[in-house]
Amino acid sequence: MAREKFQTLTEPMFYILLCLRRERCGADIAAEVRTLTQERVCIGPGTLYNLLDSFLQAEMIRETKAEGRRRSYLITSKGQDALDEEYRRLLRLAEDYRTCKEGLQ
């Protein structure tokens, strides 16, 4: 059975949505992701703008302003729900790891 789109978020998806809890443009999103992850996750412009377009189509984010080529975005309630669900999924993953690791000791 195929999974629903955005049922599981990749790291770039997760961090983009996380950053969009505050209004930001693409360049600011990329910079914030690098800062937040201490350079561990770097999102290139191709990936960033493709994901922003997908999130817009899925109504997970909305465009808040456009000044020339610079566009700003903000997460929607649908995007926040997806972000919250991914956070819970990651917590379950970590709990499964801990349970298995403790069982092997």
Task: Identify the meaning behind each predicted range.
Residues M1-A2, Y73:
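A positively charged, amphipathic N-terminal helix/segment that binds anionic biomolecules
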Residues R3-T47:
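N-terminal helix-turn-helix DNA-binding core of bacterial DNA-binding proteins
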Residues T47-L48, G79:
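Helical "lid/switch" subdomain of P-loop NTPase nucleotide-binding domains
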Residues Y49-S54:
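Short, hydrophobic-biased segments on the C-terminal half of alpha helices
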Residues L56-G68, L74:
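Beta-hairpin "wing" of winged helix-turn-helix
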Residues G68-E86:
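Basic, amphipathic "hinge/linker" alpha-helix immediately C-terminal to the N-terminal HTH DNA-binding motif
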Residues D84-Q105:
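Amphipathic alpha-helical dimerization/coiled-coil segments
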